[in-house]
Amino acid sequence: FLKSADQAEADFTLIGSTQKTHYTIENLQANTEYEILVKGIYQVDVALIEDGSKSVQIEKEIKQQTITMHTFNRSVVIDITNAPYNAVGDGKTLNTKAIQSAIDDCPKDGCVMIPSGTFMTGALRLHSDMELYLAKGAVLQGTSNPEDYLPRIWSRFEGTEMECYSSLLNLGVLDPEGMHRADYDSTFACKNVAIRGKGTIASGGRVLAERIIASETENLKDYLASLGDKIKECEKPETIPARVRPRLINMSNCKNVELAGVTLRDGACWNIHMIYCDHVVTHGCTFYSHGIWNGDGWDPDSSLDCVIFDCVFNTGDDSVSIKSGKNPQGNEVNIPTKGVRVFDCRCTMGHGITIGSEMSGGVEDVKIWDCDMEAALCGFEIKGTAKRGGYVKEIHVYDSVFPRVLMHSVGYNDDGIAGPDQPYFSDCTFDNLRLTGIYQDHEAKWHECDAIELCGFDKIGHEIRHVKFSNIRFGKEKLDTAGHISIKRCEDVSMNF
């Protein structure tokens, strides 16, 4: 229900309803105050005759809340194809300078608009208080030339701060110390940015990744040779040189960022990466990175209050991966990821929703609901290596479908010095889930698996603790089967099926 401030004496007008836990209101007036009345309705079937052959739905109001909000002023819109920018959307012309000039000229609360067409570009840098809007048919296409992603920037990959190639879109500057200051709100390098529309943001994908790995392997050949057998601690020989790859969108020390409605695809590794950020909201987006190594979709990393909903994933790795640093550096930086919310998301291919394996700074207060990850490889997974240290706790997953639930130690990405202790995994609840016990691999083949696998760490005191499963169903829909369960090195695990 909705009414504007100038309708103060009027009744609220019903504008829509939803069976989801989100709703988008469109076509509002600029610079206008609105009141929004939200009602939660519970529907029950009531029998009309004794044998129950006829029934009627009765609606029962269970909760309501009124929200007051004020829309922004109408933005100044800069079309990148207009003079003096004159960007060309022919899929051939390199438009980096033209688009960056439009971004630099964008005033506070202004909008840079990408019209229909394919606009080739290298790395771009956004600033505070702006919007990047992609019209229907617009493609912001990153090149596959590594030179177009220079200079390198200070970033973090797989839990370690390091210099990486600039991403296609770059927001903020990395500053871990800023998150520890009493006035940390004033330390954010980039605030109040929207990236939205109906178009596509794409990078150079696998070709760009392979070119960067080849170049960096040559740069590091002496160092890699000096590692000897230690290189076996890495996932593969290319792991170390691959860590300099750019993301599709890199946010460092950012606050109040919205990504909405766009297709995000073909980053050279992770697509959306938030490092030391606060309040990043992503909704209505489609992620595609199938066939790309480390092709994660959405990765909050030592960040606060990040939310994603109403998104679809077809990825070469995790759909969502919640992180907080690796081994001693992650322990010392000591910035946990907190307050993550994931709901109404669907996976058509990829690994699903994971926490870790880089979780040395801690992960807590995560809620996941209304998600369909049936086509994922892992489903829902909490993972870490024995070297990590840190903790994962207060994780709540409900009203969703997964092939399986995993909480365990893993052996990959295990290079580097160990942290001071093994990780702690505890205080997790899983309610009203369907676990199919069947997962889909990267070649779209299906395999049986344990529906629940819990395996704590081998050091005494680091068992998985305080985990509760309730209202769990096993098997494909309309085909309930016994789910295989594996539990090792755990304490206080309860199950109610």
Where in this protein do the model-derived segments appear?
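Extracellular/periplasmic carbohydrate-active domains that bind, remodel
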Residues: 1-497
